[in-house]
Amino acid sequence: MAARLCCQLDPARDVLCLRPVGAESSGRTLPGSLGAVPPPSSSAVPADNGSHLSLRGLPVCSFSSAGPCALRFTSARRMETTVNAPWSLPTVLHKRTLGLSGRSMTWIEDYIKDCVFKDWEELGEEIRLKVFVLGGCRHKLVCSPAPCNFFTSA
């Protein structure tokens, strides 16, 4: 299952704010040194009712006030470049979804910081993150007439 997330870096607290598109989420806590995700302010994350998006592939928890229940994500722009890495992030995440991988998720924090924060700081990309992959959720789909692809395109 996959869903789209809005996100923005809060430089004052050095945290990444994530929420599902179309949800009035209070945010989620990311474990480790990334810190807690604060509730998005109206100026930090633009309001989006998601009316232009298809609901297919969005788990029910995407519209929960607490946000999605499982965050398994990477920058969609990095999806193609991870295949030559020592571990392919999409493959690892898919295996975790199927319960086949024992790898700890602590390494994902370093991956995110390297791919996200470093590029923001060094390349000056303000709109760095557009689409994140969210998977591993066990909730039913809002619309499930057809099987949902694990990774969706932008």
UniProtKB/Swiss-Prot annotation:
Residues 68-117 are annotated as: Mitochondrial targeting sequence. One of its GO terms (cellular component) is host cell mitochondrion. GO terms for biological process: DNA-templated transcription; symbiont-mediated activation of host NF-kappaB cascade; symbiont-mediated arrest of host cell cycle during G2/M transition; viral genome replication. InterPro entries: Transactivation_prot_X. Keywords: Activation of host NF-kappa-B by virus, Activator, Apoptosis, Host cytoplasm, Host G2/M cell cycle arrest by virus, Host mitochondrion, Host nucleus, Host-virus interaction, Modulation of host cell cycle by virus, Transcription, Transcription regulation. Residues 30-46 have a biased composition (Low complexity). Its main location: host cell. Residues 28-48 are annotated as: Disordered. A fraction may be phosphorylated in insect cells and HepG2 cells, a human hepatoblastoma cell line. Phosphorylated in vitro by host protein kinase C or mitogen-activated protein kinase. N-acetylated in insect cells. It is found in: Host cytoplasm; Host nucleus; Host mitochondrion. Belongs to the orthohepadnavirus protein X family. May form homodimer. May interact with host CEBPA, CFLAR, CREB1, DDB1, E4F1, HBXIP, HSPD1/HSP60, NFKBIA, POLR2E and SMAD4. Interacts with host SMC5-SMC6 complex and induces its degradation. Interacts with host TRPC4AP; leading to prevent ubiquitination of TRPC4AP. Interacts with host PLSCR1; this interaction promotes ubiquitination and degradation of HBx and impairs HBx-mediated cell proliferation. Multifunctional protein that plays a role in silencing host antiviral defenses and promoting viral transcription. Does not seem to be essential for HBV infection. May be directly involved in development of cirrhosis and liver cancer (hepatocellular carcinoma). Most of cytosolic activities involve modulation of cytosolic calcium. The effect on apoptosis is controversial depending on the cell types in which the studies have been conducted. May induce apoptosis by localizing in mitochondria and causing loss of mitochondrial membrane potential. This is Protein X. The gene is X.
